[in-house]
A protein has these predicted regions:
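Bacterial N-terminal signal peptides
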Residues: 8-16
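Feature captures the catalytic ectodomains and active-site-proximal regions of enzymes
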Residues: 21-336
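Bacterial N-terminal signal peptides that target proteins for export
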Residues: 1-8
Length: 336
């Protein structure tokens, strides 16, 4: 039987003590967007049914959880996060896959849209990640190394994963323009994504960022947790390790909400949780992993949609007139 996550009673009571207030004017709201890398929608739903994710369940009770599909790009880290954090397709961002990418053009990210709408001095934009490869800010590099062999040629799962990581690394080294967020990094108020971190590392950074920027005014914080994806590649979707990683992320969600409440921020901070891609059921890869989700304490999120809808949803919740954005966002807000 899979182990259940347990939080101190005091923490659970704190979680239920206050709630996000939809009546807060949009231009007074802050927001946190969390990516659970590789979190398959069906597996998350199974965890909820087993009562293994009490903090996510509480968030959903306050707001909503809707189905999100990836429909127009490769289901991997670079392509998924490029669309999640811009709302645009690969034809605009230039981020096609983990192997084919360029820096996202300046001005297109959700961070920059918020700055354009409200001014850099009036909203802090923050990014904390758990992967250096795929979400790192690396600049142009050229490597003479040849591409790693296809993972399908590997003899076992450990070897496949080693080759996947090597292939991704070499793609980054051979890229003559830079990583997807190479240009975006310089526009942010704070960035911490230059090294791999587990949930504890990202979670502790998240608490520190909330404590630092929350009391000063409005903020938008993006957090990337890579643990589910890492365990999925190593042990497979459906494994105890994959499941335990999800339970761990739920624990950190509870701690972040508790910090928001301690700092008096939660009633005007919308929290959104999603994924860059899911996982192919029972496998160690995500080649056709289109099933993800969007969970939030924002009860106005009512419609299922696509990954390209996440950026306009968050922007609208924070008071941005998404109809005035150029180039026109291909997605729509999922809020009523």
């Amino acid at each position: 039987m899979l182990a259940r996550s347990r939080l101190p009673i005091a923490l659970l009571l704190l979680f239920s003590a206050t709630a996000f207030k939809p009546s807060t004017p949009p231009r007074q709201r802050s927001a946190i967007l969390i990516s659970w890398d590789g979190a398959l929608r069906e597996h998350v739903n199974d965890c909820l049914k087993r009562n293994q994710m009490p903090n996510l369940a509480q968030l959903i009770r306050e707001g909503r959880m809707v189905d999100i599909d990836v429909s127009d790009h490769v289901t991997d880290t670079r392509a998924g996060h490029a669309q999640m954090l811009t709302g645009y397709d690969p034809s605009v961002t230039g981020v096609v896959s983990n192997a084919v990418f360029r820096p996202i053009p300046l001005g297109l990210s959700i961070f920059e849209r918020l700055q354009q709408a409200f001014g850099k001095k009036d909203i802090a934009t923050i990014m904390v990640t758990g992967k250096a490869m795929g979400l790192g800010p690396g600049g142009p590099k050229i490597s003479a190394a040849t591409e790693a062999a296809s993972p399908n040629q590997a003899s076992d799962e450990d070897e496949k994963q080693t080759r996947r990581v090597e292939k991704m690394r070499l793609a980054g080294e051979q890229n003559v323009q830079g990583q997807p967020f190479h240009l975006t990094k310089g526009t942010l108020t704070a960035w911490d994504g230059d090294m791999p971190r587990d949930a504890r590392g990202v979670g502790q950074k998240a608490l520190a960022m909330i404590d630092k920027f929350g009391p000063k005014g409005r903020f938008f914080l993006f957090l990337h947790f890579g643990d589910v994806d890492v365990n999925g590649h190593k042990y497979g979707e459906g494994s105890r390790e994959y499941n335990d990683a999800l339970v761990t992320l739920d624990t950190w969600l509870g701690r972040m909400v508790a910090q928001l409440k301690t700092d008096g921020l939660y009633d005007h901070t919308a929290v959104y949780i999603t994924a860059d891609h899911g996982f192919d059921v029972g496998t160690t890869h995500h080649s056709k992993a289109t099933h993800i989700f969007l969970a939030s304490n924002d009860a106005q999120v009512t419609s299922a949609g696509e990954q390209r809808d996440i950026t306009p949803t968050v922007l609208q919740a924070m008071g941005v007139d998404i109809g005035k954005i150029t180039p026109t966002l291909p997605g729509k807000s999922l809020r009523k």
